Amino acid sequence: MNDLPSPVDPELAERRRARELRRAQRRRQVFIRRLIALAILGVIAIAIAGGIALSSGGSSPESATKQPSPTTPAKPTEPTKLKPEAILGAINPKVAGITTFRGNLTRTYYGHGPVPRHPAVKWRYPTSGGMCAQSADEHGVSTWCGTGWTGQPNVIPHKNGLLELRFGAYDDNYHFLNGRTGKPIKPELVTGDLAKGSATSDPDGYPLYYAGSRDNNFRVIAMDRASPTTLWSMNSETTVPYGHWNNDWDGAALVVGDYLLEGGENSWFYVVKLNRGYAGGRVTVNPEIVLTVPSWDDQLAADFSTDAFSIENSVSYRKGRVYFANSAGLVQGWDIRDILRGGSNYRRTFRFWTGDDTDASVVIDDKGFLYVASELEKYDERSTQVGQLMKLNPFRKKNPIVWSLPVRQTGSEGSGGLWSTPALDRGMLYVSTNAGGLLGVDRKTGKLRWKIPLPGPTWASPVVVDNVLIEGDCTGVLHAYDVSREGVRPPQLWSLKVDSGCIESTPAVWRNWIWVGTRGGAMFGISERARPKRAARAKNA
């Protein structure tokens, strides 16, 4: 790996200067908005005794607040006594399916084998053309196609044998397909902008789907109607005092009990009481936003001097504590046990700064250690000090780093580091790099055991099922490696040209099937290729 970044060409430098100018303008706007918001809050605090309930922990940022629900749907008209629809979820280990990104609360479940050993593309959706739409970002309006970095599908087995595939795409829609045929089984759910794809199906059997869009709205969707139906939504602009950076919803939510946990690109973490039930034979919800927590604090604003605090990863959870990171590199842990019991107390239990944009989800192992992957764009002192891949002990506040590894080799836009979420497998950790390639790292020591170069950027998060490691590259090729021997550079089992578009999305693996979308515009179903029939033996004359 290179110790220094590659030279930056003048055009790229000019784009960076323009981006920094836009960020500075946004910072000035946000500063003015914050002053106005603080003035309003001050008036309210004087007028209303008690004010807003604050966190019980002294380390909690002062702007963390309990929030009311933005809308109040009607309550169920009858008690919840009906048996939920037979949709199986993987967060619950007693049932089957991949219901959220990386399948469980700690983001460590990758699917169910067997993995195809002689794979072939069985179907493409759509059969021609692509799932494309126009959308605007800081670079202007452009056409987006297919599924991107956050686009792992849900896999939902039904009791009648149907295998359902659910995913969002850059055509602004959520799609619901027969996983074996690629044919739609329900109409699309149309949103007002990109549907990034990291959505969640209810893990407790309720026919509900939780999905965000770049149109500002995070939706709770009923799946027991003829068409997917939005029962409730929360708007990233109107549900918090003020936001930072963006209004998208990149992360896949978690459902813990009757509570939904989600982070937004508006830089806030949410806890929503769902109040799930049934009325008239149909699923109902009566959601209430019970907690919002900012992803930043004053120390981060001083250290990072930017308003880029968005949460672009999927939150993780273990034993009452939720973990997430933001695009300024702040990793936080919050104790929300009392909130999940209907109380009002919560506190920050962990704070760690990586020094740079951290979009990958925090992964938690069985001992409670955290594995964090960070990008390398700023090349500042902090990111040099702590590296881009690290194992953290969240119960050790003064020096939580167990080990760290620099990943400085540069790729797209002159950036190094990691966009993908690491995969844990026995004593190893696997992660793909922005420069292009796979790393195999010893979980205990942090020692780099091997690396495999691939055409980058490789943003898809690796998956490991039945000792097979699967990763996509940016030429549209899917690779499978035999990782049965820990610590040894794995031999490639197969590679499959899926499409010409970059594979940014994480594959979903389930019982001899692999599904993956590409930036070329389509979703693909992959399974064992048909074996040729043996030719009849020639008869002796």
Language model regions located:
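Terminal targeting segments of Actinobacterial cell-envelope proteins
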Residues: 1-32
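C-terminal region of N-terminal signal peptides and the immediate post-cleavage residues
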Residues: 47-69
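Short, flexible coil/linker elements and helix-boundary hinge sites characteristic
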Residues: 5, 9-10, 56-57, 140, ...
